[in-house]
Protein backbone atom coordinates (compact mmCIF):
# COMPACT_ATOMS: atom_id res chain seq x y z
CA UNK A 1 0.00 0.00 0.00
CA UNK A 2 1.39 3.40 -0.96
CA UNK A 3 2.66 5.80 1.67
CA UNK A 4 0.27 8.47 0.38
CA UNK A 5 -2.83 6.38 0.98
CA UNK A 6 -1.76 5.47 4.47
CA UNK A 7 -1.36 9.15 5.32
CA UNK A 8 -4.78 10.00 3.98
CA UNK A 9 -6.40 7.29 6.02
CA UNK A 10 -4.59 8.32 9.17
CA UNK A 11 -5.75 11.91 8.81
CA UNK A 12 -9.40 10.97 8.84
CA UNK A 13 -11.16 12.31 11.88
CA UNK A 14 -14.12 10.92 13.68
CA UNK A 15 -17.44 12.66 13.56
CA UNK A 16 -21.05 11.71 14.08
CA UNK A 17 -23.61 11.97 11.29
CA UNK A 18 -27.34 12.32 11.99
CA UNK A 19 -29.45 11.84 8.88
CA UNK A 20 -32.49 14.07 8.54
CA UNK A 21 -35.97 12.65 8.14
CA UNK A 22 -39.39 14.28 8.12
CA UNK A 23 -42.29 13.19 10.29
CA UNK A 24 -45.63 15.01 10.24
CA UNK A 25 -44.00 17.90 8.41
CA UNK A 26 -41.27 18.36 11.03
CA UNK A 27 -37.54 17.73 10.71
CA UNK A 28 -36.04 15.04 12.90
CA UNK A 29 -32.68 13.29 12.87
CA UNK A 30 -31.67 9.65 13.13
CA UNK A 31 -29.37 8.37 15.86
CA UNK A 32 -25.78 9.59 15.41
CA UNK A 33 -23.58 7.26 13.36
CA UNK A 34 -19.81 7.36 13.90
CA UNK A 35 -17.97 7.91 10.61
CA UNK A 36 -14.39 8.87 9.74
CA UNK A 37 -13.80 11.58 7.16
CA UNK A 38 -11.32 14.24 6.16
CA UNK A 39 -12.59 17.79 6.33
CA UNK A 40 -10.97 21.17 5.77
CA UNK A 41 -12.05 24.71 6.64
CA UNK A 42 -13.22 26.86 3.72
CA UNK A 43 -14.84 30.21 3.12
CA UNK A 44 -18.44 30.49 1.93
CA UNK A 45 -17.27 29.97 -1.67
CA UNK A 46 -15.69 26.65 -0.75
CA UNK A 47 -12.10 27.92 -1.13
CA UNK A 48 -9.66 26.49 1.39
CA UNK A 49 -8.58 28.83 4.16
CA UNK A 50 -5.77 28.53 6.66
CA UNK A 51 -6.41 26.43 9.73
CA UNK A 52 -6.13 29.46 12.03
CA UNK A 53 -9.72 29.23 13.20
CA UNK A 54 -10.64 26.84 15.99
CA UNK A 55 -14.22 26.62 14.96
CA UNK A 56 -14.55 27.34 11.24
CA UNK A 57 -17.85 28.57 9.80
CA UNK A 58 -17.58 26.24 6.79
CA UNK A 59 -16.04 22.80 6.33
CA UNK A 60 -15.55 20.85 3.13
CA UNK A 61 -15.58 17.10 3.24
CA UNK A 62 -14.61 14.77 0.41
CA UNK A 63 -16.04 11.36 1.22
CA UNK A 64 -15.49 8.25 -0.88
CA UNK A 65 -17.92 8.09 -3.80
CA UNK A 66 -19.13 4.76 -2.38
CA UNK A 67 -20.52 6.72 0.58
CA UNK A 68 -22.71 8.98 -1.53
CA UNK A 69 -25.98 7.68 -0.09
CA UNK A 70 -24.93 8.67 3.44
CA UNK A 71 -25.09 12.43 2.97
CA UNK A 72 -28.07 14.70 2.29
CA UNK A 73 -28.76 18.40 2.48
CA UNK A 74 -29.89 19.22 6.01
CA UNK A 75 -28.15 16.29 7.73
CA UNK A 76 -26.45 17.34 10.96
CA UNK A 77 -23.10 16.48 12.51
CA UNK A 78 -21.46 16.44 15.88
CA UNK A 79 -17.84 17.32 15.05
CA UNK A 80 -16.21 19.43 17.77
CA UNK A 81 -18.87 18.38 20.29
CA UNK A 82 -19.85 14.90 21.45
CA UNK A 83 -23.39 13.68 20.85
CA UNK A 84 -25.55 13.45 23.99
CA UNK A 85 -25.79 10.06 25.70
CA UNK A 86 -29.54 10.03 25.11
CA UNK A 87 -30.37 10.70 21.46
CA UNK A 88 -31.88 14.11 20.82
CA UNK A 89 -34.18 13.73 17.81
CA UNK A 90 -33.80 17.38 16.84
CA UNK A 91 -30.01 17.37 17.32
CA UNK A 92 -30.15 20.86 18.78
CA UNK A 93 -26.51 20.76 19.91
CA UNK A 94 -25.15 19.35 16.66
CA UNK A 95 -22.54 21.88 15.57
CA UNK A 96 -22.59 21.48 11.76
CA UNK A 97 -25.15 20.92 9.04
CA UNK A 98 -24.92 20.09 5.32
CA UNK A 99 -26.13 23.37 3.87
CA UNK A 100 -26.28 22.54 0.19
CA UNK A 101 -26.90 19.49 -1.90
CA UNK A 102 -23.76 17.30 -1.99
CA UNK A 103 -21.94 17.50 -5.33
CA UNK A 104 -21.35 14.12 -6.88
CA UNK A 105 -18.82 13.69 -9.68
CA UNK A 106 -17.84 10.54 -11.53
CA UNK A 107 -15.30 9.31 -9.00
CA UNK A 108 -15.46 11.82 -6.16
CA UNK A 109 -17.87 13.85 -4.14
CA UNK A 110 -17.89 17.00 -2.08
CA UNK A 111 -20.03 17.84 0.94
CA UNK A 112 -20.20 21.38 2.31
CA UNK A 113 -20.96 21.88 6.00
CA UNK A 114 -21.87 25.10 7.75
CA UNK A 115 -21.53 25.75 11.45
CA UNK A 116 -24.94 26.07 13.07
CA UNK A 117 -25.56 29.47 14.59
CA UNK A 118 -25.94 29.64 18.32
CA UNK A 119 -23.77 26.58 18.87
CA UNK A 120 -20.62 27.40 20.78
CA UNK A 121 -17.54 25.44 21.63
CA UNK A 122 -16.54 25.22 25.29
CA UNK A 123 -13.39 27.33 25.07
Predicted regions located by residue number:
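Active-site-proximal polar cores
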Residues: 1-26
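Short, conserved turn/kink motifs that form compact alpha/beta structural patches or helix kinks used as
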Residues: 21-123
